[in-house]
Structures are given as structure tokens and as C-alpha cells.
């Protein structure tokens, strides 16, 4: 192996939820100029049509059939991932092994729990060994697919998650608390100050695909509050589905509602707003924490997102508000007494925010790569 070339880091991700891709991109950006990194989605590359069907199915079930999803999620606790039984994943594993062989990485990083099992079988089949790092994109409540992963290290989002994994008998020396690897730009941005007067109070809203919840949620935010509130709605992939409804809000509340489509400025938007409302996905929750922006959870996916909500509650920076009345009441509570509760949440977030987490994770990966490159190759 030539030590004259930059270290090579293969970062494997998946599109089942935004957290995996957000973590992969954040780490890759932090590695720029220090390593040759390749971000790959093995599921997308091996079977793009089927992968798209499965992703859409995942979003549908988690949005409209949460109880069904919880049963699926809980069943994973008893699944043996060391044996490959799904034909679709066999094709993915074969394609991934070929990519590993071509790229010849010094370290493999996975932001999705299944890929370390692929790497283990690849090495057992004669592939070149290299360190395996798993970035756990959930918090506190960690699924068996992550915990049983045959990895050298788990990078986790916070102290509570590390403690949770240690309690479940994972080796402490293999659990590295780096924070969620958000975009490195967070470390350069200035959040809304803790002592901001919050007038008008700017709310950033990430709606789900559900048409039935958008208007009631917006009304709950915009009406019957102690002082002026402005709303920015980021539609993202739901732009076509929800745009006509959001236009009605723009007309109903002149100069108080803004619409964003697919935005690359999410870090900046989070740092410009006083509150975020959305689902409790790992990406949104940890980006909100990095931006010191309190959060109200309007949609909770049972299972993996329950730990993210618990983390917000332990920090003292957010809570669940799934109905219109609950959301309106939570917002009034934040804004009462000159927004004293909001100011307290901002202060709590300032003690827990990790806007440089991706650089911390990148430093760990680079150190691991250096050790691997300096070690003699196994016979």
C-alpha cells in the first residue's frame, strides 16, 4: 500500500430516512482536503428501481401506518442479520463487495446498520481487512440492527446514547461519542442569540406528506399567540403534493408565511429561526440542536424516533405536540412571560450543541486510517 496517496474512506449510506444521508454527507465534507472519500448508496446503485419502491413504501408506512411500522421495527430485535436471506439484499451485497474491492479503502464507514454485516462476510470470503466504523444516526433507543453490528467502533450522537449502549453490554472502548456529523457549515454559522427579543417569533416548519395535517398545524402556529409569529414552510420532496395548500396559507396570512421548496440552506434557515416544527428524524433533531433551535415534534415515528424525542426532553429543548391544540398550547407556553421558557431552552441548547461534530468524527476516522496504513498487511 502506497503511503504517498491520501487515505481512502468509503462511506456507505441509504435513503431510508434522511439521517443516514445527512450523516454521510457531513462526514464527507469534513474529510475534504484530508482524504479521498467516496459516498455510496449500495441499495440505490445495485437496484435503483426496487430501492425507490422500498423507500416510498418506507415513507408511506412511517407517515400513515405508524403502528404497523412499530411492529416491523420491534421484530428486528429477534432477527439474525449475520445470515443474508433477502434476494434484493444479496444483489446489493454483491455490488457493494465489488465496489469495496475497486476502491480499496483504508477505512469503511457506514451510516446504515446493515452494511457492516456485508463487510464481515466480504472479509471472511478473502477480501482485504480494514477498520469498520458505524455511525449510529439514532439516539438513546438503539435498535438491535445497530447494536449487533460487527463493527470495530460505533460513533454515537451524545452521552446518553453511549450510556444506553454500555448498559446493553457493548464494550465501552468501542463506543465513541462524537456527536451527529451535521454539515460542517454549522460551525461557521451564528444561531439566533439566546437573548434575542423574538419579535416576530420565526417558526420553521418541515411538514410530512400528509395533506390533512398541514393546514391545522399552520393555524395552530399562526393564530391566538401572545405576539406576532411568522412561518416558513419547507416543502422539500413534498412540493408538488402540498404547494396548493401552502398557497392558501400565504393568501390567508399576508406577509406572515413563506414557502421554500427543496432548499440547500437548511443549516442557515435553522440558525435564522426561533423554533422548528417537524418530525423527530435523526437529521432534523440533531441539526436543530447544532443550530441551538428549540423543536416541537409534530410527527413521531414509533421506534427509532422515540429516542430522538427523549434526547430533546432530557436536554430541555423540545417536546411532543402532535395535534393542533397541543402545538398551539406548547407555543403559547414558549412565548408567555416574555418568552422566558424559550430563552431557557436556548440556553440549554447552547450547553449541548455540537456544530463541529463532523470534524470530530472525521478526525477519528483519519486517525484510524493512519494506524491501518502503518500496520503491516496480514498474511
Model-predicted segments: where are they?
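Conserved N-terminal ligand/cofactor-binding loop architecture of enzyme catalytic domains
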Residues: 26-103
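A conserved, positively charged/aromatic
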Residues: 100, 128, 144-154
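A nucleotide-sugar donor-handling region in carbohydrate enzymes
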Residues: 152-209, 238-241
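Donor-nucleotide binding loops and adjacent catalytic segments primarily
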Residues: 197-273
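Acidic donor-binding loop of glycosyltransferase active sites
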Residues: 271-281
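Catalytic binding pocket for nucleotide-activated donors in carbohydrate/polymer assembly enzymes
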Residues: 285, 289-329
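Conserved donor-nucleotide binding/catalytic region of nucleotide-linked donor-dependent transferases
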Residues: 324, 332-351, 371-375
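C-terminal alpha-helical cap of glycosyltransferases
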Residues: 354-379
Amino acid at each position: 500500500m502506497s503511503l504517498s496517496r491520501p487515505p481512502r474512506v468509503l462511506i456507505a449510506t441509504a435513503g431510508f430516512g434522511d439521517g443516514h444521508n445527512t450523516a454521510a454527507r457531513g462526514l464527507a465534507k469534513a474529510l475534504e482536503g484530508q482524504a479521498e472519500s467516496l459516498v455510496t448508496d449500495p441499495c440505490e446503485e445495485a437496484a435503483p428501481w426496487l430501492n425507490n419502491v422500498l423507500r416510498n413504501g418506507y415513507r408511506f408506512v412511517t407517515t400513515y401506518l405508524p403502528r404497523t411500522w412499530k411492529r416491523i421495527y420491534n421484530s428486528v430485535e429477534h432477527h439474525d442479520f449475520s445470515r443474508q436471506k433477502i434476494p434484493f439484499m444479496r444483489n446489493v451485497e454483491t455490488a457493494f463487495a465489488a465496489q469495496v474491492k475497486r476502491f480499496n479503502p483504508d477505512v469503511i464507514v457506514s451510516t446504515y446498520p446493515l452494511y457492516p454485516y456485508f463487510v464481515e462476510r466480504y472479509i471472511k470470503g478473502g477480501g482485504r481487512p480494514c477498520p469498520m466504523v458505524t455511525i449510529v444516526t439514532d439516539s438513546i433507543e438503539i435498535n438491535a440492527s445497530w447494536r449487533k453490528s460487527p463493527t470495530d467502533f460505533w460513533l454515537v450522537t451524545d452521552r446518553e446514547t453511549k450510556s444506553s449502549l454500555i448498559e446493553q453490554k457493548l464494550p465501552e472502548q468501542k463506543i465513541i461519542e462524537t456527536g451527529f456529523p451535521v454539515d460542517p457549515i454549522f460551525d461557521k454559522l451564528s444561531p439566533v442569540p439566546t437573548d434575542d427579543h423574538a419579535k416576530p417569533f420565526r417558526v420553521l416548519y418541515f411538514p410530512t406528506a400528509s395533506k390533512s395535517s398541514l393546514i391545522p398545524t399552520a393555524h395552530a402556529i399562526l393564530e391566538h399567540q401572545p405576539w406576532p409569529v411568522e412561518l416558513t414552510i419547507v416543502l422539500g420532496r413534498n412540493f408538488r403534493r402540498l404547494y396548493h395548500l401552502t398557497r392558501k396559507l400565504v393568501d390567508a396570512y399576508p406577509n406572515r408565511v413563506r414557502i421554500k421548496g427543496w432548499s440547500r440552506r437548511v443549516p442557515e434557515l435553522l440558525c435564522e429561526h426561533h423554533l422548528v416544527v417537524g418530525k423527530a428524524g435523526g437529521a432534523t433533531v440533531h441539526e436543530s440542536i447544532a443550530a441551538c433551535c428549540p423543536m416541537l415534534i409534530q410527527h413521531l415515528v414509533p421506534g427509532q424516533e422515540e429516542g430522538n424525542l427523549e434526547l430533546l426532553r432530557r436536554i430541555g429543548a423540545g417536546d411532543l405536540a402532535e395535534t393542533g391544540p397541543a402545538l398551539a398550547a406548547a407555543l403559547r407556553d414558549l412565548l408567555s412571560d416574555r418568552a422566558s421558557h424559550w430563552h431557557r431552552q436556548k440556553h440549554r441548547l447552547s450547553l449541548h450543541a455540537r456544530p463541529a461534530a463532523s470534524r470530530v468524527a472525521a478526525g477519528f476516522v483519519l486517525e484510524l486510517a493512519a494506524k491501518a496504513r502503518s500496520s503491516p498487511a496480514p498474511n
